[in-house]
């Protein structure tokens, strides 16, 4: 979960988010090296009086600044493509949950269970209890089993929405008339907060998402009480 004045990412709680954090560090290091090289060259230009006014052709230099950027782009593209394929890969999910976006709340349907559906609204500020998080608490949490692949089917009944949970590396658009999917695997139990990440109207800021990841036994007990 995020905290005040946070500058970095939230702690990763899924394999996908772990990969995204590694890719971020990898790319940031490349950007740092390029920036350092550019600043070094600029400092040399400003502090020395060496000039090459008579130079008309420099094949070696042109070759270097053509090949080197191509290599850098390959070093960025390959791990990026790998993560994209990992995010799209779904192998025999144990549970499927259908998520529908509305103005301005979410509804959930556990397709593996009969009549296990509910709406999830934000709890107003005046109704919060001590310890609750303002603008992020909901009346019905999405309870899911941890360490088990879960397929999320995401769509919308009105306008564009986006179902996003940062600590799990999830952000999938909810588009009317189209069903998108995402894979969710949590490596630890806990509460994970998210929000609608697509401007969808006047109450866009009041569409929080709360996932409660629990051991499988607790999930089975929860489904029994809900049915």
Curated annotation (Swiss-Prot):
One of its GO terms (molecular function) is copper ion binding. Cu cation A1 binds at residues 161, 196, 200, 207. The chain crosses the membrane at residues 15-45, 60-87. It is a multi-pass membrane protein. Keywords: Copper, Electron transport, Magnesium, Membrane, Metal-binding, Mitochondrion, Mitochondrion inner membrane, Respiratory chain, Translocase, Transmembrane, Transmembrane helix, Transport. It catalyses: 4 Fe(II)-[cytochrome c] + O2 + 8 H(+)(in) = 4 Fe(III)-[cytochrome c] + 2 H2O + 4 H(+)(out). Residues 46-59 are mitochondrial matrix. It is found in: Mitochondrion inner membrane. Mg(2+) binds at residue 198. One of its GO terms (cellular component) is mitochondrial inner membrane. Cu cation A2 binds at residues 196, 198, 200, 204. Its EC number is 7.1.1.9. Binds a dinuclear copper A center per subunit. Coiled coil: none annotated. It holds the Pfam family COX2_TM. GO terms for biological process: ATP synthesis coupled electron transport. Belongs to the cytochrome c oxidase subunit 2 family. NCBIfam families: CoxB. Component of the cytochrome c oxidase (complex IV, CIV), a multisubunit enzyme composed of 14 subunits. The complex is composed of a catalytic core of 3 subunits MT-CO1, MT-CO2 and MT-CO3, encoded in the mitochondrial DNA, and 11 supernumerary subunits COX4I, COX5A, COX5B, COX6A, COX6B, COX6C, COX7A, COX7B, COX7C, COX8 and NDUFA4, which are encoded in the nuclear genome. Component of the cytochrome c oxidase, the last enzyme in the mitochondrial electron transport chain which drives oxidative phosphorylation. The respiratory chain contains 3 multisubunit complexes succinate dehydrogenase (complex II, CII), ubiquinol-cytochrome c oxidoreductase (cytochrome b-c1 complex, complex III, CIII) and cytochrome c oxidase (complex IV, CIV), that cooperate to transfer electrons derived from NADH and succinate to molecular oxygen, creating an electrochemical gradient over the inner membrane that drives transmembrane transport and the ATP synthase. This is Cytochrome c oxidase subunit 2. It comes from Tupaia glis (Common tree shrew).
């Amino acid at each position: 979960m995020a905290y005040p004045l946070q500058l970095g990412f939230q702690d990763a709680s899924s394999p996908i988010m772990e990969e995204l954090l590694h890719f971020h560090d990898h790319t940031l290091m490349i950007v740092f090296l390029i920036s350092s090289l550019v600043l070094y060259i600029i400092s040399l230009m400003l502090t020395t009086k060496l000039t090459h006014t008579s130079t008309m052709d420099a094949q070696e230099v042109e070759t270097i600044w053509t090949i080197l950027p191509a290599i850098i782009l390959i070093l960025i593209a390959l791990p990026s493509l790998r993560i994209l394929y990992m995010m799209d890969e779904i192998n025999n999910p144990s549970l499927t949950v259908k998520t529908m976006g509305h103005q301005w709340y979410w509804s959930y349907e556990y397709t593996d269970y009969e009549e296990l559906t509910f709406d999830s609204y934000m709890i107003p500020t005046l109704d919060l209890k001590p310890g609750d998080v303002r603008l992020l608490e909901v009346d019905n949490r999405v309870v899911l089993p941890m360490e088990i692949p879960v397929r999320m089917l995401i769509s919308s009944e009105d306008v564009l929405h986006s179902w996003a949970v940062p600590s799990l590396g999830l952000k999938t658009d909810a588009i009317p008339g189209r069903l998108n999917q995402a894979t969710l695997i949590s490596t630890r139990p806990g509460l994970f907060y998210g929000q609608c990440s697509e401007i969808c109207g006047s109450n866009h800021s009041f569409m929080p998402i709360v996932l409660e990841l629990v051991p499988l036994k607790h999930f089975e007990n929860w489904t029994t009480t809900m049915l």
